Amino acid sequence: MLIFNPFHWSRWLLLYLLLFSTGTHVLGETQSTEPAFSDENPVYLALWDQARELQLFHHPYWLKLLHFYSFGESVGQWSFKSDVVNDGFFLSPDGKTDPSAELKATLKAVLSPLSKDPNQHARCKFIARFNWLRSSLDFPELPKLACPLFERWSNLEEATGISIVFVSAYLKNPASTFGHLLLKFNSRNRHFGHSLLRPTLNYGAMINPDDNPFIYALRGLFGGYEGSFTDERFYNFNHIYGENESRDLWEYPLNLTPDQQYLVTFHAWELLQKVQFTYYFFLDNCAYRMAELLEMAWTDTTRINTSGAIWAIPVDVVFKLKKFKRNTEGPPLLGSPKLIPSRQRKLQQRVAQLNEAEQEQLRKLIEYTNNLDSEEFLSFPEPSRALILDALLDYQQYKKIDNLTLQQQKERTKLLLVRSKLPVLVNNVSSETSKSPTEGTPPMRFRLGTVFNGLLGPALEVGTWANYHDLLGDESGHLQNAEVVTLDLRLRFRENSFELTQFQLFNIQKFALNPTGIFGDYEWSWRARGGWEREHYGCSPCREFRITGGFGRSVSFGGKDVEFVFVDLFGETKKNAWSATTWGYAPHLGMMWSPIDIWKIRFEGGWFKSFSGPKREYFRIRFDQRLTITQDWDIRMEIEQFESLEGTLALHYFW
């Protein structure tokens, strides 16, 4: 006979309440109103004993999931701790410094009763942790739990892959000087399957809009900002970078297995829960964090980032992914790139499609839109008129002609009406001839050269730099006629001595040609550099700190040449005293020419004249050549006159 035992049934009721009772969570935090989880829970104790026996809290993947690093592995790390700075990421009060305590707290959280809002449960918020622990331990069958927000965001059933998007450099913003990286989640969803509608992950600094440029640079360099991940549809990033800032975007599909895609997607979701890191422009930036996220695809010690590195550059991450290969039989990790051209590139290509008469008509319409009714414009055949008006509309968008007067609005309406009556043209704008960033030279460089100085004799020179690109280098996939070089260090060795001949902190130059391809359009060229250099080439130990910057004009007559004129302002000092600083101006004239892709020459001369401080007046002339051997090697020949004639023959290795 069945005997009713209140104590027996109360134990089952307690177990039911522990497993199925509800609670509430605050989005992005780990606080809960659920009943306290008992440390005596037999399921928890069994799993914890198993985890302790397997030493899971020391497993490389668990440390990856918590972003734990040892001393020197990550910038600002002086002890074994997590890079995450906000408490909401940790389920244990000691989780930031103790991975064992965080593992215990995670086990308790994933076994805790289901809450009213399933999205707040640890199995949904920390889905990467839960899935890895479940695959590593003998979990019992748990109550089914749907995660509506994650499922809607990830759309795993229709996911087709992950792409990394490289955004070209933007010299008007220091944080984007070396480019930017995005991570794009692709799917075949009928609503969000279009490339522009796909979820895209971004990492950036949480800046204060009231900070002036000096404070902005200072805080960015020394960790004064926090960084976080955000996600938006890809069209938003394409609009910001490609349309507003005229930056090319290169999309590289990643050859990950479905399981690897899931691992990356799981942790990406965790990072979107208001997780914050300390942001450093040169290291803890988008390049470092995006590469770190991709490392989640492997549950072992696989790294894409370099431990102990002092900088992280977006294009360097793309090169690392290109070289990355887990085995000799599988495909490379980085797939073939697709160019998403900037608004400026598309406009230039449209203008290039016009013949001389059509370009002349376009210039007239830019000056006076009412020329739409002129006999001259109407004399063009309809396809030509359509081409001209398409270029005109692109030009107006490129110039951001938005705040229109009433009359201009009427002219714009008329322009659109006229265009609507003309035939639709096949878009012949092509990007097939454009080379991707991974076809150019890698960003790091080692230099070995032999030097002969007319006064000081021969020497051996070694040097290194961290750069995005230099003016004389191969421009494949890089900003055209631009230079971004940092930390350019050069040492010279003579018989029984060595000397520091140069330590350039930064050297940024932009030689702007016609931005649209329309005759008469121009932008100012500009450049700036600063660092320690020799006072002149006739004195070996004479060094000074020199800062230079200026504006100029650049033109091209044949497409493979650039002629330029600059007026620079400069400051030179040998001491830290303000009174010892020489300030002056320096007009320059020069040219660059690349008759074939593997060969480029540059000539430049300048006259320096002081107007304040110790008087100085001198000329500097330089002639350089570059001959490309392979993608990773080139030869440079440099001849310079600065008090003494000096020649250098150097071999460069890029990696």
Give residue spans per PLM region.
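Long, charge-dense tracts
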Residues: S32-N119
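Glycine-rich catalytic cores of cysteine/serine-nucleophile enzymes that process amide/ester linkages
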Residues: E158-S246, T464, G473, L491-F503
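Active-site nucleophile-His-acid catalytic modules used for acyl/amide transfer and hydrolysis
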Residues: F234-V315, K574, E638
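Outer-membrane beta-barrel initiation region
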Residues: A287, G335-L479
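Transmembrane beta-strands of outer-membrane beta-barrel proteins
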Residues: M444-F446, V462, V485-L487, G520-A528, ...
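Residues that define the transmembrane beta-barrel architecture of outer-membrane proteins
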Residues: L456-V462, E483, S497-F503, P541-G549, ...
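Outer-membrane beta-barrel "beta-signal"
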Residues: T464, R626-L627, E643-W655
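Repeated loop/turn-to-beta-strand initiation elements of outer-membrane beta-barrel proteins
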Residues: H469-G477, K510-F519, S556-V565, W593-F603, ...
